[in-house]
């Protein structure tokens, strides 16, 4: 089936400031970001790739890159964080949610380059996804991660996720969060797509 995009959500484009004042562009991913995503994955350590996919991945497959860059923005919403290093556009983080068969439920995942961790980027991207998901009618987010992935588990606790052992997968933790009511999210002509009145904010 040919790739089709429902509507590119330009309102999700943002410039954010991290803990130490670094400015980062966050925007929805595009099909032409394929090579940027390849470079991003190559920059992750073997452990980081294993944590992201829950199994060893040495090289992203063509199918994986297709899934990561050809996003319809209806059932699948994906963001990249980028900076310019030595004059070159460089992806330093990615975050996404994919709706389940029950459209009120979505799986969320993210990864951040090691040199950019601990600066608040993961939390900012997760918050942006949560707000968009709430406005789109998603009621619950979930994710799975290895029990040894302390960075993600720590982020999940701070973001208000409930953590429990997976019922059917050894060494795997399941993370779940109920989002706030949709009526707490409204459009704002001056500041983009959504404003959070407080519900669902961790």
Model-found features: residue ranges?
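Long, contiguous binding/interaction regions
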Residues: 1-202
């Amino acid at each position: 089936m040919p790739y089709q995009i429902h509507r590119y959500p330009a309102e999700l484009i943002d410039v954010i400031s991290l803990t130490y004042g670094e400015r980062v562009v966050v925007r929805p991913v595009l099909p032409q970001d394929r090579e940027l995503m390849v470079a991003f994955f190559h920059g992750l350590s073997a452990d980081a790739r294993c944590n992201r996919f829950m199994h060893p991945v040495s090289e992203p497959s063509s199918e994986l890159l297709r899934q990561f860059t050809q996003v319809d923005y209806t059932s699948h919403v994906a963001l990249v964080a980028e900076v310019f290093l030595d004059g070159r556009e460089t992806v330093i983080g990615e975050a996404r949610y994919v709706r389940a068969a029950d459209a009120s439920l979505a799986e969320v995942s993210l990864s951040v380059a090691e040199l950019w961790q601990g600066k608040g980027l993961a939390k900012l991207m997760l918050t942006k996804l949560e707000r968009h998901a709430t406005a789109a009618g998603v009621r619950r987010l979930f994710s799975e991660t290895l029990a040894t992935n302390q960075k993600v588990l720590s982020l999940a606790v701070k973001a208000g996720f409930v953590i429990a052992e997976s019922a059917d997968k050894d060494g795997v933790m399941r993370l779940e969060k109920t989002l706030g009511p949709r009526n707490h999210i409204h459009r704002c002509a001056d500041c983009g797509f959504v404003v959070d009145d407080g519900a669902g904010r961790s």
